[in-house]
Amino acid sequence: MPGIGLDELPAGNDAEILNLFGGGSIVSRLAALGFVPGMRVSMVQNRGHGPLIVSVINTRVALGRREAVSIRARRITA
């Protein structure tokens, strides 16, 4: 599987969404929130446990770890 799970992205880093995996309801919810292939996101908070806060389309979204694992992304380096 290319890329990393979004749960692995440290706070303060950006990534490009590569793909979504998981059950249809999870994928549908994530896509509705803007987590679609090609979208750039920024990790606001990732403490290694509990929910993450991700900025997508200028909106902060709280994701559970299970949801974040379903998102494959490519880290963007400056």
Where is each model-derived feature located?
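Conserved beta-strand/loop element in small beta-rich adapter and peptidoglycan-binding domains
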Residues: 37-43
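C-terminal structural segments of small proteins and small subunits
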Residues: 12, 46-78
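Short, basic/aromatic beta-hairpin or loop at an interaction surface
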Residues: 8-21
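Short, charged beta-turn/beta-strand-edge "cap" motif at the junction between a beta-strand
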Residues: 4, 23, 45-50
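Short alpha-helix capping/helix-loop boundary micro-motifs
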Residues: 2, 25-29
